[in-house]
């Protein structure tokens, strides 16, 4: 019982660490509400403007809505594209100045609601028809609506956004800060002037651009199409040229594209994850291998008797692996539960980045990331690997002994 308990706890420890990595990966990169189209999206989050003749003149920043309009929207492979700002602190209140709140607000465009799927509790999303009206239209989160009006039925009401009267046209369910691109508490539309091109500076802005492809197979065509249009734009510029620095990025590159002047090192990222998983698998497996070897030494005589009655080495190894698999699966279930607790306890640390530091929202975890079939399948696969590594070698060594040696327990 003691060895079995230690074996279960050892397996649980390994599975806890492995599945914490898997769940974190799922939360950052998988198709999860509201960012349900990550696998079909490409992203632009950096822009480099350089002098044509004077290469020492450089300006690094973010792309603009005008860049999206000129170089991305016309491509036939693009189903939708949106330009949005990072959620920033804003002040909202009732029109009489009461119930003042600090909120996280972003400005975007109508295509935002085609790419990101937020759940509307009241009203609807804004469209091009609302752009440029007498009063700006906004969408707010349920928590902001409740704090301002005491109810989520706030569509049609007015409030102050940074001391400007705006009209609320929709209320959405709160989303987690872990939704890197979609997260905000108030969504408004940027001014149509941002779409106009007046010079090279028009392509430099403060936007991140998400591009929804019809299928991931269209990614190469979109990349080539954007590169061609950038080349055409540069041909028309006199002193400057724009450089998209090997963008667009897929979701993994996008999340890890921290600096505007340096792209992400994806091979190193994958290598780090691979080394971490290898070490987490290997070290507990070696310890469990020693425990399994101790159990095998206690069963040498039993194995000798079974071989004497005709059991083959392969049959004995399979039986031992099956017996050990029960303990491994128990440890796997315990480890999976512990991994949920660990990720929940460390969620703020795991998912805080340069964009969401100081945000007012909650770092809640998606049920899709925690309870997706992929998580359970991977947990089972890692259990099988640990079982094979920890019990396979001792079982093979034990069955290699002759019948006489086994019966004499030498």
What are these regions (language model features)?
Residues 232-276, 298, 346-375:
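Membrane-helix entry/capping segments
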Residues 1-14, 21, 35-38, 316, ...:
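Alpha-helical transmembrane segments of integral membrane proteins
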Residues 1-29, 262-301, 329, 385:
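Hydrophobic alpha-helical transmembrane segments of multi-pass inner-membrane transport and secretion
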Residues 9, 28, 372-410:
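C-terminal membrane-exit region of the final transmembrane helix in multipass inner-membrane proteins
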Residues 19, 23-26, 142, 340, ...:
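Transmembrane alpha-helix boundary and packing residues in multipass membrane permease domains
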Residues 109-125, 136-262:
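Mid-to-C-terminal secondary-structure elements
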Residues 22-148, 152, 161-166, 348, ...:
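Structured, solvent-exposed hinge/loop segments at the ends of secondary-structure elements
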Residues 2-6, 10-14, 301-347, 378, ...:
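Transmembrane alpha-helical interface segments in multi-pass membrane proteins
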């Amino acid at each position: 019982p003691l060895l079995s308990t230690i074996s279960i706890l050892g397996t649980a420890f390994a599975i806890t660490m492995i599945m914490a990595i898997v769940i974190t990966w799922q939360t950052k990169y998988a198709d999860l509400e509201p960012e349900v189209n990550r696998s079909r999206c490409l992203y632009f989050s950096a822009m480099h403007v350089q002098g044509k003749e004077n290469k020492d003149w450089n300006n690094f920043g973010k792309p603009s809505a005008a860049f999206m309009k000129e170089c991305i929207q016309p491509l036939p492979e693009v189903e939708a594209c949106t330009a949005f700002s990072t959620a920033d602190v804003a002040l909202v209140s009732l029109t009489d100045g009461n119930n003042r709140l600090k909120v996280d607000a972003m400005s975007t465009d109508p295509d935002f609601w085609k790419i990101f799927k937020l759940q509307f509790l009241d009203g609807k999303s804004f469209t091009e028809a609302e752009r440029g009206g007498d009063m700006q239209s906004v969408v707010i989160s349920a928590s902001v609506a409740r704090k301002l009006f005491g109810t989520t039925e706030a569509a049609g009401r007015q409030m102050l956004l940074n001391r400007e009267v705006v009209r609320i046209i929709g209320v959405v369910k709160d989303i987690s800060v872990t939704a890197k691109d979609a997260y905000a508490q108030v969504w408004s539309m940027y001014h149509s002037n941002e779409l106009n091109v007046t010079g090279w500076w028009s392509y430099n802005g403060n936007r991140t651009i998400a591009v929804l492809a019809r299928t991931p197979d269209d990614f190469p065509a979109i990349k080539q199409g954007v590169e061609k249009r950038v080349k055409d734009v540069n041909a028309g510029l006199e002193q400057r040229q724009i450089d998209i620095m090997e963008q667009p990025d897929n979701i993994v590159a996008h999340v890890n594209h921290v600096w505007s002047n340096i792209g992400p090192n994806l091979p190193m990222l994958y290598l780090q994850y691979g080394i971490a998983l290898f070490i987490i698998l290997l070290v507990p497996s070696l310890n469990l291998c020693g425990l399994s070897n101790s159990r095998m030494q206690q069963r040498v005589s039993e194995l000798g008797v079974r071989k004497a009655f005709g059991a083959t080495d392969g049959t004995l190894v399979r039986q031992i692996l099956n017996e050990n698999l029960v303990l491994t699966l128990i440890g796997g279930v315990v480890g999976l539960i512990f991994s949920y607790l660990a990720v929940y306890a460390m969620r703020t640390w795991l998912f805080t980045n340069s964009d969401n530091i100081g945000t007012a929202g909650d770092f809640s975890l998606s049920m899709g990331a925690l309870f997706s079939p992929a998580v359970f399948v991977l947990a089972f696969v890692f259990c099988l690997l640990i079982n094979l590594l920890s019990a396979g070698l001792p079982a093979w060594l034990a069955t290699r002994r002759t019948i006489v040696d086994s019966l004499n327990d030498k």
